[in-house]
Structures are given as structure tokens and as C-alpha cells.
Amino acid sequence: MSTINQLVRNPRKKKVIKSGVPALDSCPQKRGVCTRVYTTTPKKPNSALRKVARVRLTNANEVTTYIGGEGHNLQEHSVILIRGGRVKDLPGVRYHTVRGALDTTGVDSRMQGRSKYGTKKPKK
């Protein structure tokens, strides 16, 4: 235990909490323009072709974002909305695209978990 004099000379340091999504600047979402849309492979032991996009945000940051769901319409110069949330098996991917917002279409033929993929309720 420290004495009062020791604490006066050298106070206790606050723990610095590092953000998992620094490019969002404490915002829930950010808008950006796709600079490159491509597929990449996950790390071991998984195997797939994951769809990702390189995005230049409105605050001039450039980040890699994951495009969830089956199929997408994104290409270079598409304007998209991104949110936080990393992809565990893709190193360096800390953001997700928001489906159904701006230039991104929702996932067609999606029946469950529709709100996460920007799909409208099907007509009866």
C-alpha cells in the first residue's frame, strides 16, 4: 500500500481503455465510399471466400469492412454505411457494412433475422 506522500508525489494512473473501432470517432455508424471490393480467405482452420470492401470514410480514414449475407451489389464508388463489429477469422477487419442502407441492397429471399440484412417483410 502506498503512503499519502508517495501518492502526492506520483498519483495513481487511470487505466486507458482502447476502442475496438477507432475510425468511427465515437459515432454509431459512418458513411464512406468503396475504393476496392474483393474477396479474401479466412485464417485457419476456416476456409471460404469472404466478401470485403476497402472504404474511405467521411473522416478521411480508410478501413476494411465485411459485407455480410448472400450476394451483394457493391462495386467501386458505391456509398455505404459501416458499423462496428469485427470478423474473428479475418485479421484487420473490424467493421461491418449495414445492409439495406444507402447504396447497399438488402439480402433477397431472407426470412429470418431480416432486420440484420435490410430485408423488407414479405407480402402475404
Curated annotation (Swiss-Prot):
Organism domain of life: Bacteria
A GO term for molecular function: structural constituent of ribosome
Record keyword Ribonucleoprotein present: yes
Keywords for this protein: Methylation, Ribonucleoprotein, Ribosomal protein, RNA-binding, rRNA-binding, tRNA-binding
A Pfam cross-reference name: Ribosom_S12_S23
Residue ranges of the region described as Disordered: 105-124
Any one GO BP annotation for this protein: translation
UniProt keyword annotation of tRNA-binding present: yes
PTM sites of type 3-methylthioaspartic acid: 89
One annotated Gene Ontology cellular component of this protein: small ribosomal subunit
PROSITE patterns according to UniProt: RIBOSOMAL_S12
Function as written in the Swiss-Prot or TrEMBL entry: With S4 and S5 plays an important role in translational accuracy.
Annotated family: Belongs to the universal ribosomal protein uS12 family.
Subunit description: Part of the 30S ribosomal subunit. Contacts proteins S8 and S17. May interact with IF1 in the 30S initiation complex.
Record protein name field: Small ribosomal subunit protein uS12
Annotated source species: Vesicomyosocius okutanii subsp. Calyptogena okutanii (strain HA)
